[in-house]
């Protein structure tokens, strides 16, 4: 089909996630994905960004190249810290969102500035995943590296910079180390903890509080960067923040480059989500997010007040325990994922009183980092593989429903849910979701929605008009009455401590006071589940987490 089009009439979208780089080539008129390619990323929480650049080149080649591409935009994993010296050289391997060595740094920032102040100014409360906390860690633990920092960028910022023809002095990049050409967008910048989604500007005081240095925004393509004459004490350069369809410039080959976006914001674009839509993404971990024009203010830190990629807001809640819960069920039951789904469907709603509290890796919402998973309400009568499988699916979805409630407490309304991610293909997940959620659930076809969202942004940048692309649905699930949530709450919320929030001084979530015996009768047993119960995840082929410090994969 691409051969029937004139040269350079297509658009490309890139999803540079934690584990891989994916490229889609799209017809801008219809949104049809014509070609695609991918390449793996190195495993780890510290990665040389040059590996991402190599993977991008490989993925572009696998997608058939960009000879017929008129515009491209890059979305990517959020929060990662890339530091550049005055010659554009990466100072140290990037610290990814999943590098949590900066936990103490995040807590120190909250203690110094206050959770309420952070929310009022940045819309979020720092956690270890956020860029500002990583900068504080770098300042305190690697002062020599910190002293060399001339610019700070996020993963998608740096890749866009390279795509524009920039690079370190030691490379063959035609534009050289032009730090003034660094760009970002509001959705990605809002995950740093030194950018305000409210004002759309950097908060340089918060940057100084984190890193102990002054900063300024990149001046843009008309400025001249001279690495040899830049004083050592010059302010740190932060990428210029572009509007939702503002051009970053052109590649050396003449391809228009869009502003890019954070992964969840790009997914919302790819899905065509709007006010009243709430996206529930079930990958390795989970995210719940919804585009809105409302101001978001949650001092507990559970709901991150991020910016969206279309000029609005994207309140987001992350849970650590999503599709990996299904992996654990498969290991525990010594069954395949297909068999676990069949077992779960053979049980009744509520698993005959058996409840899983699914905190296998602690939890982020509520903030219980040291919690473990538990099977509650176990009796001789309900101790069957079918009930265990059902309890695991219900526990996973109830955790996401808690995230949904946290988002809705910000004043949002919900008309429909969009269920995406690898686990959305699981028939038991789809069926049990009807017992957990109280509004209709649309299940879109499996697709690379992050990359498609980036392609949609590229088309928007190219034409000046946001395209309307059809998203095909494979199912619409209608809710049915049940007491599953009530049963779950009776056990899960007995775990919620008074400080179960990101902010140390925030109280118990409003719905945490359910009576501990609600919905369950009789003498029961509790089983605590610990240890490594993970396996290769058939349901979590999404590989990056959501922006609140638990990036969930959102592509299909």
In which residue ranges do the predicted regions lie?
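N-terminal glycine/serine-rich phosphate-binding loop of ATP-dependent small-molecule kinases
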Residues: 1-93, 104, 120, 148, ...
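Active-site core segments that coordinate phosphate-bearing ligands/cofactors
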Residues: 12-13, 110-122, 136-182, 196-209, ...
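Short, glycine/acidic-enriched loop or turn micro-motifs at the edges of active sites
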Residues: 18, 30, 102, 188, ...
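Short beta-strand-loop/turn "lid" adjacent to the catalytic site in phosphate-handling enzymes
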Residues: 65-98, 122-131, 151, 160-196, ...
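Asp/Glu-rich intrinsically disordered low-complexity tracts
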Residues: 222, 228-232, 493, 499, ...
């Amino acid at each position: 089909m691409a051969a029937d089009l004139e040269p350079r009439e297509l658009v490309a979208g890139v999803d540079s996630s934690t584990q891989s780089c994916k490229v889609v080539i799209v017809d801008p008129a219809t949104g049809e994905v014509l070609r695609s390619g991918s390449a793996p990323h190195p495993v780890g929480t510290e990665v040389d960004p040059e590996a991402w650049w190599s993977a991008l080149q490989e993925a572009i080649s696998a997608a058939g190249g960009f000879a017929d591409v008129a515009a491209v935009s890059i979305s990517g994993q959020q929060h990662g810290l890339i530091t550049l010296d005055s010659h554009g050289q990466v100072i140290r391997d990037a610290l990814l969102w999943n590098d949590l060595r900066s936990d103490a740094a995040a807590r120190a920032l909250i203690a110094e500035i206050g959770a309420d102040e952070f929310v009022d100014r940045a819309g979020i409360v720092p956690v270890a995943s956020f860029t500002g906390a990583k900068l504080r860690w770098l300042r305190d633990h690697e002062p020599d590296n910190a002293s060399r920092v001339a610019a700070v960028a996020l993963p998608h910022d740096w890749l866009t910079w390279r795509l524009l023809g920039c690079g370190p002095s030691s490379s063959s990049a035609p534009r050289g180390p032009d730090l003034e050409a660094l760009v970002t967008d509001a959705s990605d910048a809002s995950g740093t903890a030194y950018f305000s989604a409210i004002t759309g500007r950097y908060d340089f005081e918060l940057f100084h509080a984190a890193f102990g240095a002054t900063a300024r925004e990149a001046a843009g393509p008309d400025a001249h960067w001279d690495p040899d004459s830049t004083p050592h004490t010059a302010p740190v350069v932060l990428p210029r923040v572009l509007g939702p369809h503002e051009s970053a410039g052109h590649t050396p080959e003449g391809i228009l480059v869009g502003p890019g976006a954070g992964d969840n914001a790009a997914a919302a674009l790819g899905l065509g989500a709007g006010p009243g839509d709430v996206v529930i993404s079930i990958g390795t971990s989970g995210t719940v997010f919804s585009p809105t024009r409302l101001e978001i203010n949650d001092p507990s830190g559970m709901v991150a007040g991020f910016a969206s990629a279309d000029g609005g807001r994207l309140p987001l809640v992350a849970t650590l325990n999503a599709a990996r819960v299904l992996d654990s069920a498969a290991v525990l039951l010594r069954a395949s994922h297909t068999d676990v789904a069949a077992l779960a469907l053979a049980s009744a709603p509520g698993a005959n009183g058996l409840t899983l509290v699914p905190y296998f890796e602690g939890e982020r919402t509520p903030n219980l980092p040291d919690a473990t998973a538990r099977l509650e309400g176990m009796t001789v009568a309900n101790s069957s593989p079918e009930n265990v499988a059902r309890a695991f699916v219900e526990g996973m979805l109830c955790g996401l429903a808690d995230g949904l409630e946290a988002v809705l407490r910000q004043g949002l309304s919900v008309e429909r849910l969009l269920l995406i991610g690898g686990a959305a293909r699981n028939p038991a997940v789809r069926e049990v979701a009807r017992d957990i959620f109280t509004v209709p659930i649309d299940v879109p076809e499996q697709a690379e929605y992050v990359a498609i969202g980036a392609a949609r942004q590229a088309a928007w940048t190219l034409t000046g008009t946001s395209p309307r692309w059809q998203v095909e649905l494979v199912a619409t699930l209608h809710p049915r009455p049940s007491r599953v949530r009530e049963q779950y709450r009776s056990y899960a919320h007995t775990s919620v401590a008074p400080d179960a929030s990101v902010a140390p001084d925030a109280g118990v979530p409003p719905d945490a006071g359910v009576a501990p015996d609600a919905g369950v009768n009789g003498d029961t047993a509790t089983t605590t589940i610990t240890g490594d119960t993970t396996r290769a995840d058939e349901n979590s082929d999404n590989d990056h987490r959501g922006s609140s410090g638990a990036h969930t994969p959102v592509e299909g």
